[in-house]
Amino acid sequence: MPKISAVIITYNEENFIGRCLDSLDGVVDEIVVVDSFSTDHTEEICKQHNVRFIKHAFEGFRDQKNYALQQAAYKNILSLDADEALSDTLRESILKAKNNWNYDGYMVNRRNYFCGKWIRFSEWYPDRQLRLFYVDHGSWGELNLHERFMLSNGAKIGKLKGDLLHWPFTSHEDHTEKMSRYSKIGAQEYHKSGRTASIFTPYIHGIWGFMRTYIVKGGFLDGREGFRICSHYSRSAFNKYKLLRKLNKEAKKK
């Protein structure tokens, strides 16, 4: 039977990490936490569990996750964020995969919680993620904000039953602050990669972002929460491309 290393990166996750670690009990053979020098109680909560706790300066989400993979003792990896946890059904599904590992990686549906409600649409569910994989067959790639584990060509991918539970925001204010921060990071990453934006680009992405998430993806079926999520998404897309255009213009002046 193959052994599994759970790998998590953290920074000030005292409100979430305990639940995440509890959900891994009895499922994985090792838990590796790579922490970016948290200033809250993240470290002491982790050390109450059977965790290998490593401090490492933050390099961006993609690079930090690749560094964390290098610290794992086993080749089969379960990658989680600190604000995620395994549902009971997903726990059972991972144990079955562990007993009969037939794929290079496994997809899982992620279910997101927002201000008292599990979101069913709004492009937030099923929110498919590749989180269980054989590490030698891929790596974390793409942009640092939109990183994903990329398997090599020809890799076989299976599907796990159950949901990966996700608590991405603690409040409306937290949602607003994080989306603003993600817009800035996204614009900077796009600029580094050579992307450009015209005067129309922010409006196109902002309007289409709302239409896609609220209408096409059924965000209206999530009620008031769906409207808030889709509105924030639209505003974030607009701000990201507005800042990208600003960065493009500043670069031309140099």
Describe each model-derived feature in a short phrase:
Residues 1-23, 254:
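N-proximal low-complexity "stem/linker" segments adjacent to membrane-targeting elements
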Residues 3, 29-30:
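Residues at the starts of beta-strands that form the adenosine-phosphate
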Residues 28, 50, 72-74, 154:
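Short, well-ordered alpha-helix to beta-strand connector turns
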Residues 57-72:
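Glycine-rich, basic loop-to-helix element that forms the pyrophosphate-binding segment
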